[in-house]
């Protein structure tokens, strides 16, 4: 190293190179070290070892350069336009993810190191100028989350170097790509569901219409129940009706033997005679109740006595102090007691209001005796 410095008359250390670049040397700023000789170029390559934190991968940007070189971005007026510069920009629009490569992994061995190839200043400046721009643009959110085709095109260049800084981005891309098929599957399922929904709506609509038809049909035609066939009404002849009426006037209730005899005499069945008597008694009780009310309201107890020849009755003089409602209730009680029907209890008839008077207990001249046993009339024998 010392011999080379003595031969050339200048030092090529990092400090010397940077100080020379700051002083405005055109050869140093343009990066053209070929005029200084092969020894200087070798010294520069030996001292310009790649940094582990270098974010510029020359495998993706400049395939002809075997090592990565960190350079300051040149001034815009120093960059010359050329076809090669456009060629580099075209291939490095979207650089691969940043990676930190160890120095010993990228530094070529003396046996495997290819001979240095001369590069023009435009190519070096183009690669140096394009590197910072593309390296900063790859960290945008839209570039990380978006599905950009230039990144996919540069994937073969970036896969040649593995780095721990490169793993999260690959995982995020893989997660993003694995998330997209899930979204597509869910979209496909929703589309299938939407396609199936009209069919299900049609099915539901069809079942609803069928249910409505069944309801309307059930309303229009109610279910036929198994009813017993109604018996035909018996048409009695005049002779049969006259004989039944005469028997009813004599006897309101028939015994089993009397009913069978009457049915045989009239050429009827026992059931027909029994049914006729039940209907006739119902009609008779209704007519009698109405008649008793009318008689009680009118006070005509002589007609009541003629209608119901009973040994016990309520005398008009005893019932004269009661109102019409009480008299009608008393008459109905007498009527029910005559024909063996259970009397309906009246609130005013819970206790006996008037005593029962014997017909033969009347005094001479038709004057009633309230208590013929305790107050005998003179001239009448005392009953013993």
Curated annotation (Swiss-Prot):
Record-annotated DNA-binding residue ranges: 229-288
CDD domains the UniProt entry points to: homeodomain
One annotated GO molecular function: DNA-binding transcription activator activity, RNA polymerase II-specific
PANTHER family assigned: HOMEO BOX HB9 LIKE A-RELATED, VENT HOMEOBOX
Cellular compartments annotated: Nucleus
GO cellular component: nucleus
Protein name as it appears in the record: BarH-like 2 homeobox protein
UniProt keywords, alphabetically: Developmental protein, DNA-binding, Homeobox, Nucleus, Transcription, Transcription regulation
Classification of source organism: Eukaryota, Metazoa, Chordata, Craniata, Vertebrata
Keyword flag Transferase: no
Source organism (scientific name): Mus musculus
Major localization class: nucleus
Positions of region (Disordered): 1-134, 154-235, 364-384
The keyword Transcription regulation belongs to this UniProt entry's keyword annotation: yes
